[in-house]
From Swiss-Prot:
<keyword id="KW-0446">Lipid-binding</keyword>
<feature type="binding site">
    <location>
        <position position="94"/>
    </location>
    <ligand>
        <name>hexadecanoate</name>
    </ligand>
</feature>
<dbReference type="GO" id="GO:0008289">
    <property type="term" value="F:lipid binding"/>
</dbReference>
<dbReference type="InterPro" id="IPR003797">
    <property type="entry name" value="DegV"/>
</dbReference>
<dbReference type="Pfam" id="PF02645">
    <property type="entry name" value="DegV"/>
</dbReference>
<dbReference type="InterPro" id="IPR043168">
    <property type="entry name" value="DegV_C"/>
</dbReference>
<dbReference type="InterPro" id="IPR050270">
    <property type="entry name" value="DegV_domain_contain"/>
</dbReference>
<comment type="function">
    <text>May bind long-chain fatty acids, such as palmitate, and may play a role in lipid transport or fatty acid metabolism.</text>
</comment>
<protein>
    <recommendedName>
        <fullName>DegV domain-containing protein SP_1112</fullName>
    </recommendedName>
</protein>
<feature type="binding site">
    <location>
        <position position="62"/>
    </location>
    <ligand>
        <name>hexadecanoate</name>
    </ligand>
</feature>
<feature type="domain" description="DegV">
    <location>
        <begin position="4"/>
        <end position="277"/>
    </location>
</feature>
Length: 279
């Protein structure tokens, strides 16, 4: 039986114990802060990256893993003749998935590369489900089919307390940013079809609370498989959201600090709600 190994990138927000238990390989992106390059793998300590970003003169810059790194990792993982499934963040956020494809073409490994259309814990949903099926001995076709199902039943919502980082990082248009006067604006967006689509914006904390109330109303009519909550900065609002949402899903909600790659673009006091519905 051919063993299938699962690879993803460090934009995924996931519990370390799951990575170990499911034998997931995470390829780190890098972050440059005031001309010093850090591997994302070295910035996982709670609050460490946020402090570096607050102290930096310029907005940090993220870089995808080099093609050669992917090629080496793929080559190493296939030494026993197994197959590899690499699931990465949306191409709209980073060139990582394309670097993985190029790395696969340079290696002798049997690699299938998938664009998750998401990032953070929404990427985790696909990666974890794929890894579970791989451990059960399912073939590539069955795993890919299930990953597609998970993708099609996932929603990613992100709330930011400033649009400055998203605009500077080129992740939303400058026009949108200027109309919102950049600072002190709270916005909730949905990632859909590889785009961040604005849903609501306003100046006070009520912006987030009103939107959450509307989300909860919609959840009561749907079968929720799992929910993840990620945050940057204080986790107070994340915990408050968990208390409000836990009644709508059987599985415990994961509340995790998002990594440096996402924090670079969202800034401080941002959050995300990631929802996977039953097929």
């Amino acid at each position: 039986m051919t063993k299938i190994k699962i690879v993803t990138d460090s934009s995924v927000t996931i519990e370390p114990e799951l990575v170990k238990q499911l034998d997931i390989t995470i390829v780190p992106l890098s972050v440059m802060i005031d001309n010093v390059v850090y591997s994302d793998a070295d910035l996982k300590e709670e609050g460490k990256f946020l402090q570096l970003m607050q102290e930096s003169k310029n907005l940090p810059k993220t870089s995808q893993p080099p093609v050669g790194v992917f090629a080496e990792i793929f080559e190493d993982l296939c030494k026993d003749g197994g197959q590899i499934l690499a699931i990465h963040m949306s191409h709209a956020l980073s060139g990582t998935v394309e670097a993985a494809r190029q790395g696969a073409s340079l290696s002798t490994a049997d690699v299938t590369v998938v664009d998750s259309s998401f990032t953070d814990q929404a990427l985790k949903f696909q990666v974890v489900e794929a890894a579970k099926l791989a451990q059960e001995g399912k073939d590539m076709e069955a795993i890919l089919s299930h990953v597609e199902e998970v993708k099609n039943h996932t929603e990613l919502y992100i709330g930011v307390s400033t649009l400055e980082n998203l605009v500077k990082g080129g992740r939303i248009s400058r026009v949108t940013g200027l109309l919102s006067s950049l600072l002190n604006i709270r916005a909730v967006m949905q990632m859909k079809d590889h785009e961040l689509q604005p849903m609501v914006k306003g100046r006070g904390t009520k912006t987030f609370k009103k939107w959450l109330d509307e989300l909860i109303t919609s959840l009561s009519e749907r079968a929720v498989a799992e929910i993840g909550i990620s945050y940057s900065g204080s986790d107070d609002w994340a915990k408050e959201m968990k208390e409000s949402l836990q009644a709508y899903v059987e599985k415990p909600i994961s509340v995790l600090e998002t990594g440096s790659i996402i924090q670079t673009h969202t800034g401080e006091n941002a959050w995300a709600i990631l929802i996977r519905y039953h097929s």
